[in-house]
């Protein structure tokens, strides 16, 4: 499982590729992760600018203009910044394609990670509200 320093390193590594950019397309190839990815997530996220990328414990929070995506890497997950046309690997489950043409690709062999949506303050979400920073 990625530990806190790895999650913070991941946040810092992808931050400049997402903050200030618009989500051009969100592609979910495998919705059956730890919790099912919301069916309408692409509709909710597409076209929204990422305002901020935060970390709360081992969760990454993508603050958008109208709502937030909450991501956990799970036991074996990773996020990579790639050109969209990069060939897929076996466990590449989600692509967050940015207006820059770059893609944030979520790979999770064990599928213990998650990508969730909230329109409320994400810090009050049941998964986050009792966690320390």
State where each predicted segment sits.
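Extended, highly charged segments
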Residues: 1-56, 61-65, 97-98
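Phosphate/anion-contacting hairpin/loop surfaces
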Residues: 69-133
């Amino acid at each position: 499982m990625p530990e806190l320093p790895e999650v913070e390193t991941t946040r810092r590594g992808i931050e400049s590729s997402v903050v200030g950019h618009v989500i051009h397309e969100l592609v979910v190839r495998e919705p059956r992760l730890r919790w099912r990815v919301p069916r309408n997530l692409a509709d909710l996220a597409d076209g929204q600018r990422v305002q901020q990328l935060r970390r709360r414990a081992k969760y990454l929070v993508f603050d958008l203009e109208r709502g937030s995506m909450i991501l956990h890497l799970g036991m074996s997950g990773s996020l990579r910044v790639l050109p969209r046309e990069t060939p897929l690997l076996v466990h590449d489950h989600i692509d967050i394609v940015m207006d820059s043409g770059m893609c944030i690709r979520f790979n999770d062999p064990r599928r213990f990670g998650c990508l969730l949506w909230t329109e409320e303050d994400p810090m009050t979400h049941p998964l986050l509200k009792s966690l320390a920073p």
